[in-house]
From Swiss-Prot:
Core subunit of the mitochondrial membrane respiratory chain NADH dehydrogenase (Complex I) that is believed to belong to the minimal assembly required for catalysis. Complex I functions in the transfer of electrons from NADH to the respiratory chain. The immediate electron acceptor for the enzyme is believed to be ubiquinone. This is NADH-ubiquinone oxidoreductase chain 5. It is an enzyme of class 7 (translocase). Belongs to the complex I subunit 5 family.
Length: 384
């Protein structure tokens, strides 16, 4: 067991140190307005070449640092939360595979390498959802996998359409050809892929179902990293969303998702599903502000939301663990007396989610409201 504990701790210290260094580097990139584009050729066949490309700018480095920070804390949390599990070694390896897939997605300006990270996320999340290997987990895992397949097919079709341009490095073509019909089709396909991964209507059923996974997985995968991959992809493709019909369609869908998730959470008794539905409403908020053209604001809310939602899930995991694995909120009472520290952290995260002044959620949500009020589409959104 000591070997496994050390394995967890090594992963924790390694990921945490990389996270802090990447955060400092991203601040330097932001202040100096630096962008590094690294490309090398893997294979060349006559006029066709396969190249591996990485894009390092402040946005990708900062998002990577946040993903690594939450991953390291989740691994540290799993050290004791899952210490009775025989397969904790396999669990940590799956989490590390997930982090690698997420890194691949974040730093790729190339649709093919994005697909590698995208499919890696889908596969590893399926393995993590079915981790407990019972009928409920298998059903939830299949629903998760099949819902995400639609987005994978849309991304493959976008790769096929990119052949019209002669390269898959979409970042070169977004600004120049954003009014072309081909780029509109590619943008529509990317938007469909992002809607499946970020669980917008009509693909939102898989996110509450994926709560069959262990709680550390919910804290990492289904709150802060996997579900925000779709939002991050749309942030990268934000020039294509300047098309008015795409933006209005996305605004309508995300508004409906917010409404549906908020309404559904009122009638739910499962603690983890309530938090999952709040994640869904926050994803709807990110998508709606993205459709109005404020992509940096969507990124800011993505970062703040990741932190307090991971804390919410970890506190929920602690409560469920002490309730002898019962997730029914009707069975919980007087928790503030028996678990004061956990309840304090839970309430802090809850107030941040509500937008309490001077907590993380306040800064992003207040900015979002201010920008929407001052925006020219505010009449449409108010009527919505």
């Amino acid at each position: 067991m000591n070997y496994l504990v050390n394995y967890c701790k090594i992963s924790f210290y390694f990921l945490m140190s990389i996270s802090l260094s990447l955060f400092l580097i991203s601040l330097k990139f932001l202040l100096m307005d630096l962008v590094y584009f690294i490309e090398w050729e893997i294979l060349s066949l006559q006029s066709m070449s396969i190249v591996m490309t990485f894009l390092f700018d402040w946005m990708s480095l900062m998002f990577m640092s946040f993903v690594l920070l939450i991953s390291s804390l989740v691994i540290f949390y799993s050290n004791q939360y899952m210490e009775e599990d025989y397969n904790i070694n396999r669990f940590i390896l799956l989490v590390l595979m997930f982090v690698m897939s997420m890194m691949m997605l974040i730093i790729s300006p190339n649709l093919i390498s994005i697909l590698l990270g995208w499919d890696g996320l889908g596969l590893v999340s399926y393995c993590l959802v079915i981790y407990f290997q019972n009928v409920k987990s298998y059903n939830a895992g299949m629903l998760t996998a099949l819902s995400n397949r639609i987005g994978d097919v849309a991304l493959l079709l976008a790769i096929a359409w990119m052949l019209n341009y002669g390269s898959w490095n979409y970042i070169f073509y977004l600004d120049m050809m954003k009014n072309n019909i081909e780029m509109m089709i590619i943008g529509g396909l990317v938007m469909l892929a992002a809607m499946t991964k970020s669980a917008q209507i009509p693909f939102s059923s898989w996110l509450p179902a994926a709560m069959a996974a262990p709680t550390p997985v919910s804290a990492l995968v289904h709150s802060s990293t996997l579900v925000t991959a779709g939002v991050y992809l749309l942030i990268r493709f934000n020039d294509v969303l300047m098309n008015w019909w795409m933006a209005q369609f996305l605004l309508l869908v995300s508004g409906l998702t917010m409404f549906m998730a908020g309404l559904g959470a009122n009638f739910e008794f499962d603690l983890k599903k309530i938090i999952a539905l709040s994640t869904l409403s926050q994803l709807g908020l990110m998508m709606s502000i993205l459709s109005m053209g404020f992509y940096k604001l969507a990124f800011f809310h993505l970062l703040t939301h990741a932190l307090f939602k991971a804390l919410l899930f970890m506190c929920a995991g602690s409560i469920i663990h002490n309730m002898k694995n019962s997730q029914d909120i009707r069975m919980m009472g007087s928790l503030s007396m028996s678990m004061p520290l956990t309840c304090s952290c839970f309430n802090v995260a809850n107030l941040a989610l509500c937008g309490m002044p001077f907590l993380a959620g306040f800064y992003s949500k207040d900015l979002i409201l201010e920008m929407v009020m001052l925006s020219y589409v505010n009449v449409f959104s108010f009527f919505l």
